[in-house]
Regions:
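Extended basic (Lys/Arg/His-rich) segments that typically form rRNA-contacting surfaces
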Residues: 9-220
Length: 220
């Protein structure tokens, strides 16, 4: 019953999504005079590269692309997936169960999100390099007083005589960041069709000018 219900739910839900770029953060005032930190997201027109259908591929999806690439810089195999009238794109993304009916070559802009108040944004977080447990996991650390030799270390990880070894998945120093992160339910504060930007409340993962995947919020 659970599998059937979950499958039925997935078949009924339709998504809206586009490829975008992160411009940076700023702040705006609302009607009450409150200061709101916002992230500016630029959504240039996305080109429909290909479509997937249940009859041909077993599922419904749309492949979108942005940023033209030099034809001399792409391989023949990569170029062959584009129609003759479409220039090769640097960034491609497949969106399953796309809500809007589209054809290859169509241009989809930020008007797709008209009337939507909350968005989910996915990107790769900033890489922090190899970090200790205090920065990576928020450990308290040791005393900073005189005579202490335990300041920013993780402490004992092997426990006592039993079990006498370190378990898997223990929080330890390591490489931090540079992971795929999704921030859900970001409120749309302001839109500007002329500048092709959407301002959402709060922060978005990634550095400036990074590629974002913007979708309509699943949980709203």
């Amino acid at each position: 019953i659970w599998d059937d219900g979950r499958k039925l739910f997935k078949e009924n839900i339709r998504m809206k999504g586009l490829i975008a770029k992160k411009v940076g953060m700023t702040q705006v005032f609302d009607e009450s005079g409150n200061l709101i930190p916002v992230t500016v997201i630029r959504i240039d027109p996305n080109t429909v590269i290909a479509t997937r259908t249940k009859e041909r591929n077993g599922y419904d999806a749309v492949v979108l692309g942005i940023d033209d690439a030099k034809e001399s810089r792409v391989t023949k195999a990569y170029k062959n997936q584009f129609a003759e009238n479409i220039a090769p794109k640097r960034t491609l993304k497949e969106f399953r169960d796309f809500e809007k009916e589209v054809n290859v070559g169509d241009q989809i802009g930020m008007e797709l999100f008209d009337g939507i108040r909350f968005l989910d944004v996915t990107s790769t977080s900033k890489g922090k390099g190899f970090q200790g447990v205090m920065k990576r996991w928020g450990f308290h650390g040791g005393r900073a007083s005189h005579g202490s030799k335990f300041h920013r270390e993780a402490g004992g990880t092997g426990q006592s005589t039993t079990p006498g070894h370190t378990f898997k998945n223990i929080k330890m120093p390591g490489r931090m960041g540079s992971k795929k992160v999704t921030i859900q339910n970001l409120q749309v504060v302001k839109t500007d069709a002329d500048l092709k930007v959407i301002m959402v409340r709060g922060a978005v993962p990634g550095n400036k000018d990074c590629t974002l995947i913007v979708k309509s919020a699943v949980k709203k």
